[in-house]
Amino acid sequence: MKHFFVEGNSLPEAYHNALVKLNDEGQIVPCPAYNTETKECGMTFYVENALAEPRLSRCFIGGHHELQQYVMEVCDGILDFMIGKGENVWEYTYHDRIKAQIDFVVKELHNNPNSRRAIIDVRDNSVDMFNDHPACLQNIMVMIRDNKLDMKVLMRSNDATEATFMNAFAFIALQEKIAKELGVGVGSYTHTANSFHSYKKDWGLLANFVARIQENTESTYEYKGFYDELMAGEIPEV
């Protein structure tokens, strides 16, 4: 399986380049777990300025309510109470696995800004080896370079059409939160997915996203002064 590298100044630019590459050069592979096929490749997309505008892609499933909720799931743990409850028992949330390690990476980088040890491990072998839905997110590494916090994320599997943008946007929100604690700026964001894929049911959606991107018609939103206000308005409902 090929692994591609794309980049952009902003998150939407890099993400859109990744979608185009998957659509054009992804390999069709069977997915017996869901009795379907996927279009797949390995993918790394590099965002030079994680907070650059326009910061919102229109090429994702959901809207400002869903995005606000997901950011709060990752950064604030609003759904941690679901762990161990319900018919479909949640074994974990990303926040539950991340929260105990935030203090470590902040302390590590405070003591040694050049450290290469500030890593948050999300995979838990004691659980994930026996889980039908092991964590897609494997680890997050943060580094300070040029007085800015860079973040590097590794995912074993990432649904390009239904999950990737919301994942990356929320992880950048976490990056911003950690940078604020350290008193540094926000730098680059690098997102690697060993399996960057789109399920067969979404191939039409992927093609529509790519057509919109290539025609350069209404594919982004500004965040500051527009989408941030829409998202903030959803907080009471979340």
Language model regions located:
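Terminal, non-catalytic protein-protein interaction segments that mediate quaternary/complex assembly
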Residues: 1-238
